Regions:
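His/Asp/Glu-rich mid-to-C-terminal helical/loop segments that flank catalytic regions of hydrolases
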Residues: 213-241
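Active-site rim beta-loop-alpha module in soluble metabolic enzymes
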Residues: 127-178
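A C-terminal functional module that forms or caps the active site or interfaces directly
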Residues: 171-210, 215
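N-terminal short beta-loop-beta anion/metal-coordinating cradle
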Residues: 1-76, 229-230
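Non-transmembrane, aqueous-exposed alpha-helical and coiled segments at domain scale
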Residues: 48-51, 61-63, 70, 75-85, ...
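Acidic/polar active-site rim loop that often engages polyanionic ligands
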Residues: 111-128
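Alpha-helix C-terminal capping segments
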Residues: 57, 83-86, 98-104, 191-199
Length: 241
């Protein structure tokens, strides 16, 4: 860990749980807290990085849900400070764009590894391919497959690619052929986890697909809410395993 053993950007107002969910979107952190935590208390409000904590509805054990903001630099800062505060395992619950035609809107992806096409994971000295914690990723896959009958969407497992740009352009290099989807934070979070010997994993919902001509199809708000709730339930189950 770098030489800042205290939290500078997170100002906790409640006790941190040892297990943490990491959505990027502060609004999704609130929505997940309202669904997954009984009587959630605000954990952090500073910098607009909303976080919530309390007993999980599923098992009564402490759970914290902390937004990371967008992109690898912000995500790395948040996880670093959570480690300083005592987190023991973390799961990113986020969104992604499909890179394969067999993926549909609302499908869930368990990221076994992230291919770092970003600056943050490289700055952290990580290899280009950074693995999720194997045991936590396997727990996510089991939980997702057990729930798929209720959720009625497909579950996929494999590599994703993490990038710095959301609005890509022709100067960006082509994505690796084995990547299922593209997102922005997993490589940085995995890199921080590896450096700190912290189990970190990632479950993603597909929110964008692209046809052969490159036209984007975007998930609607209701379907996104359902997908986020599914991801949250899967992640809590995995953290309880």
């Amino acid at each position: 860990m770098p030489a800042y053993p205290q939290a500078i950007h997170l100002h906790p107002t409640a006790e941190l749980a040892e297990r943490v969910l990491l959505p990027g979107d502060p609004g999704r952190a609130l929505a997940l807290a309202q669904t997954l935590i009984s009587e959630p208390r605000m954990f952090n409000h500073h910098r607009g990085l909303w976080g919530y904590t309390g007993p999980a509805c599923a098992d009564g054990e402490p759970l914290t849900i902390q937004a990371t903001g967008m992109g690898g630099p912000s995500a790395a800062i948040v996880l670093h400070e959570l480690i300083c505060l005592g987190v023991s395992r973390a799961i990113r619950v986020g969104t992604c764009g499909a890179l394969r035609p067999d993926l549909g809107l609302g499908d869930l992806i368990i990221a076994r590894e992230s291919i770092g096409a970003d600056g943050t994971s490289r700055a952290l000295g990580a290899d280009q391919r950074i693995a999720a914690d194997p045991a936590l990723a396997e727990a996510l896959l089991r939980a997702a497959r057990a729930q798929v009958g209720d959720y009625t969407r497909c579950v996929h497992s494999g590599a994703v690619v993490s990038v710095d740009l959301f609005y890509d352009d022709s100067r960006a290099p082509p994505h690796p052929a084995d990547a299922l989807a593209v997102e922005m934070e997993a490589a940085s979070l995995f890199a921080v986890g590896v450096a700190a010997s912290l189990p970190v994993a990632c479950v993603l919902a597909v929110t964008d697909t692209f046809d052969a001509a490159g036209s984007r199809r975007r998930i609607d708000d209701h379907a996104l809410l359902i997908a986020a709730e599914a991801m949250g339930a899967v992640a809590v189950t995995a953290l309880s395993a």
